[in-house]
């Protein structure tokens, strides 16, 4: 019988196959221990998302919401959302509810790049201060819970952080001074908390920020001038705070600003003409302040406003004629001011209801019942 000899090519394949097998890593035992401690501080009774987190399975391969580095076996991502299109939510036909707190053991996951534990409605306690030791962290999203306490004072140590979302919690205290060291930050959302104090004067050093959502807090002081240098800023929401002073003229020079919400503050003075002539601005809500003067007559063929709300101020004078030359105005509310004169006819006024003009000093004409 002829003896079968392995060819050089088949031997090479065997070496490659063995090499590939050798680099497939299982979950780091240290990380698995940290995840078990993390799980033990949380309770999710409805969906059973922790059912896959078994001692007998590999956390990198079978644990819901966990991702690992394929080479090192270190845990890199925890992604657990209480509202999701994932099959586990669709099958249950409901959003999730989770209670408990964030165990400091999560800080032992030193390769973590993303920590998402959002929209569970019932997670309480404070953010562990040691979270600032996770040097690789790029995403921290804990929105939609009942987390208390302050933003960790040393948050600025997270030099790679790109997303910080702590919205819709019960947090207090001021914006830490170190936060302005997060030079990679692109998205900051602290909406609907109890954050106090002023916006840091050097806030504009966050040059990469495109979204700043700080509405529904207790912020005071004025809008820092340093924000004028944030050339990537597209969305700025400071609504429902206690911001005072004038709307800065430089806001009209922010080329990519598309959403500006300053509703329900204590802003005074006139509306800068440069702001309303900014052709990139899509949504502007300046309502419920103490703004005075006339509505700037600066609209034109490049004006494209999805929504313009100037209601509940002390604006006087006439509705500017140039508004009729705007390319598009979807929603307009100038009610509850001191405006006078005839409401222009034609676009965009022909599709607006009386509520857009009500409670002014002496406006007249359609759609109001007051004739001129």
UniProtKB/Swiss-Prot annotation:
One of its GO terms (cellular component) is chloroplast. One of its GO terms (biological process) is DNA repair. The keyword Plastid does not apply. LRR repeats lie at residues 136-158, 160-183, 184-205, 208-230, 232-254, 256-277, 280-302, 304-326, 328-350. The keyword Signal applies. One of its GO terms (molecular function) is nucleotide binding. Residues 1-26 form the signal peptide. InterPro entries: DNA_repair-toleration, Leu-rich_rpt, LRR_dom_sf, LRR_N_plant-typ. Keywords: DNA damage, DNA repair, Leucine-rich repeat, Repeat, Signal. PANTHER family: DNA DAMAGE-REPAIR/TOLERATION PROTEIN DRT100, DNA DAMAGE-REPAIR_TOLERATION PROTEIN DRT100. This protein is able to complement bacterial recA mutations, but its native function in the plant is not known. This is DNA damage-repair/toleration protein DRT100. It comes from Arabidopsis thaliana (Mouse-ear cress). The gene is DRT100.
């Amino acid at each position: 019988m002829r003896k079968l000899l392995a060819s050089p090519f088949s031997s090479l394949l065997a070496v490659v196959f063995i090499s590939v097998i050798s680099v497939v890593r299982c979950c780091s035992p240290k990380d698995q221990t940290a995840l078990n401690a993390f799980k033990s501080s949380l309770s999710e009774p409805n969906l059973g998302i922790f059912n896959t987190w078994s001692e007998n399975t590999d956390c990198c391969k079978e644990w819901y919401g966990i991702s690992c580095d394929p080479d090192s076996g270190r845990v890199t991502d925890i992604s657990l959302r209480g509202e999701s299109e994932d099959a586990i939510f669709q099958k249950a036909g409901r959003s999730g509810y989770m209670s408990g707190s964030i165990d400091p053991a999560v800080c032992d996951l030193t390769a973590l790049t993303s920590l998402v534990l959002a929209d569970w409605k019932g997670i309480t306690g404070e953010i562990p201060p040691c979270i600032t030791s996770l040097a690789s962290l790029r995403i921290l999203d804990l929105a939609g819970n009942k987390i208390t306490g302050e933003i960790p004072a040393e948050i600025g140590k997270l030099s790679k952080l790109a997303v910080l979302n702590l919205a819709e919690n019960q947090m207090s205290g001021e914006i830490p001074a170190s936060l302005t060291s997060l030079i990679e930050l692109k998205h900051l959302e602290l909406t609907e908390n109890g954050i106090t104090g002023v916006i840091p004067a050097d806030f504009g050093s966050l040059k990469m920020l495109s979204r700043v959502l700080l509405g529904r807090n207790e912020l005071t002081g004025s809008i820092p001038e340093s924000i004028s240098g944030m050339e990537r800023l597209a969305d700025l929401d400071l609504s429902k705070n206690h911001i005072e002073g004038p709307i800065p003229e430089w806001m009209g020079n922010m080329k990519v600003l598309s959403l500006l919400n300053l509703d329900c503050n204590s802003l005074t003075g006139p509306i800068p003409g440069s702001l309303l002539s900014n052709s990139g601005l899509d949504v502007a809500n300046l309502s419920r302040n103490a703004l005075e003067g006339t509505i700037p007559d600066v609209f034109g063929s490049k004006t494209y406003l999805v929504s313009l709300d100037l209601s509940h101020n002390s604006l006087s004078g006439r509705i500017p004629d140039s508004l009729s030359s705007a390319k598009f105005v979807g929603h307009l509310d100038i009610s509850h001011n001191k405006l006078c004169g005839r409401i222009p006819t034609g676009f965009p006024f022909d599709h607006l209801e009386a509520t857009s003009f009500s409670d002014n000093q002496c406006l007249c004409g359609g759609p109001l019942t007051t004739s001129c």
